[in-house]
Amino acid sequence: MSIKINHELPIPEVLKNEYPLSNEQKSIKQQRDKEIRRIFTGESDKFVVLVGPCSADNEDTVCEYVNRLKKVSDKVSDKLMIIPRVYTNKPRTTGDGYKGMLHQPDPDKAPDLLAGIIAIRKMHIRVLQETGLSSADEMLYPENRSYLDDILSYEAIGARSVENQQHRLTASGMDIPVGMKNPTSGDLSVMLNSVIAAQHPHHFIYRGCDVETSGNPLAHTILRGGVDKYGQTIPNYHYEDLIRLYDLYSKKDLQNPAVIVDVNHSNSGKQYKEQIRIVSEVLHSRNYNPDVRKLVKGVMIESYLLEGRQDISDHMTPGCSITDPCLGWEDTERLLYDIAEKC
């Protein structure tokens, strides 16, 4: 075989016992989960802001970022539900490049999956411990979510994974909101089919076990733009796109219709400064049409301590993205206050 086994990894229960949540942390997360659930069921009119670096590459800088986020969150908590975006595993278009802290706890060193699963659990716990903000991550590898399923308050399934059956079936067993992104083609039917699958019960194999799920009523959509056959970006955050999605939802028998608008990726063409303008347009659309307001539950923003991006090297600047370019902190802080004022 062409697969070499380096070593076995500890099962999730072992890692959870070694790096447990305290009773206080469990209580904080439980309360946050209730508040977030109420937003997606329509019982609360707070606006969700999923915000953070493209990739969580360093525990100290990520925690510094989320501590700053906490100060803003405390001031706008009557309007916004801020969920730190702490993404620890990254899909790569060609399979090459930095794949996240799960693979490389130190971007300068060789991949180490054992160190990686420990590092990402410790970082998510530290974020919760220091700030009281439970975080979001991407479910890139369905079987790996069991290492974090007691910590996360939100998960996203990316554009390259959304058609995969194991992702859809695993999402059906989650008890937190899970966002299904439109695929890179921009096909909204694929995204909605994923939501249908995730909201229904299933019977399948998971981590070597025969399992059944009850369906996830909080599964919803994420608009992130697409790319056409010529490689040109196709944004889908405009008013007419939101109306189209509303109409498509109306034709489906789905619980809790909702969308999060990802204002980077193909919606911005990775022009990170455009995120500010796109957020403003989304909020304008919400305020213009009550149906759009009810549907659009929040936005997703890529932001870090410093703006832009950098290549991995021996002299990297802490707090600057090593994957996609991000907004810097000053712009992020202003944007969050602006969202709270307009939403």
Give names to the regions the model predicted.
Residues 1-41:
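N- or domain-start disorder-to-order transition segments that initiate the globular core
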Residues 11-20, 213-230, 316, 320:
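Gly-rich Lys/Arg/Thr-decorated short loops/hinges at beta-loop-alpha junctions or inter-strand turns
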Residues 25-42, 72-83, 89, 120:
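N-terminal beta-rich core of secreted/periplasmic extracellular enzymes
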Residues 40-43, 70-77, 125-130, 213, ...:
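Acidic (Asp/Glu)-rich catalytic clusters
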Residues 48-61, 324:
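Conserved phosphate/anionic-ligand binding catalytic regions in large, soluble enzymes, centered on
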Residues 52, 261, 328:
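Conserved, mostly hydrophobic/aromatic
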Residues 66, 79-244, 265-266, 270, ...:
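Active-site-facing alpha/beta catalytic cores
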Residues 304-343:
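Internal helix-turn-beta structural module
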